[in-house]
Swiss-Prot record:
Official protein name in the record: Large ribosomal subunit protein uL23
UniProt key word Iron-sulfur: no
Organism: Chlamydia abortus (strain DSM 27085 / S26/3) (Chlamydophila abortus)
Upper classification of the organism: Bacteria, Pseudomonadati, Chlamydiota, Chlamydiia, Chlamydiales
This protein's encoding gene: rplW
HAMAP family according to UniProt: Ribosomal_uL23_B (MF_01369_B)
Cited InterPro entries: Nucleotide-bd_a/b_plait_sf, Ribosomal_uL23-like, Ribosomal_uL23/eL15/eS24_sf
Length: 111
């Protein structure tokens, strides 16, 4: 197995990702966005060659002290987007990446 920190690059923090985490808490955050769910969901940026079982193993080994169990992993490949740099004079692209939405079993959390 690869080093878990090579598979999981970092936690992905956006408004939508925080809403997914808030829906599992049942504390009123994100109430308008959707229904509450029993299983917490967290979003990570992962290696582009990582598979779903490899992502699950890496997360369980990184958070072994919290004894989390991964229920499911959904992956999304984000394509590079056109971007303008230097006041619109140069055109380029943003970097593409792969993100994983990980669902833990009920009662398991990393936060």
């Amino acid at each position: 197995m690869k080093d878990p920190y090579d598979v999981i690059k970092r936690h992905y923090v956006t408004e939508k990702a925080k809403t997914l985490e808030g829906l599992s808490l049942g504390n009123g955050e994100g109430k308008k966005k959707g229904s509450y769910c029993k299983h917490p969901k967290y979003t990570f940026i992962v290696d582009s060659n990582a598979t779903k079982p490899l992502i699950a193993q890496a997360l369980e080994s990184i958070y072994a002290d919290k004894k989390v169990k991964v229920k499911s992993v959904n992956t999304i490949c984000v394509k590079p987007q056109p971007a303008r740099m230097f006041r619109g004079k140069r055109k380029g692209k943003t970097a593409g990446f792969k993100k994983a939405v990980v669902t833990f079993y009920e009662g398991h959390s990393i936060g």
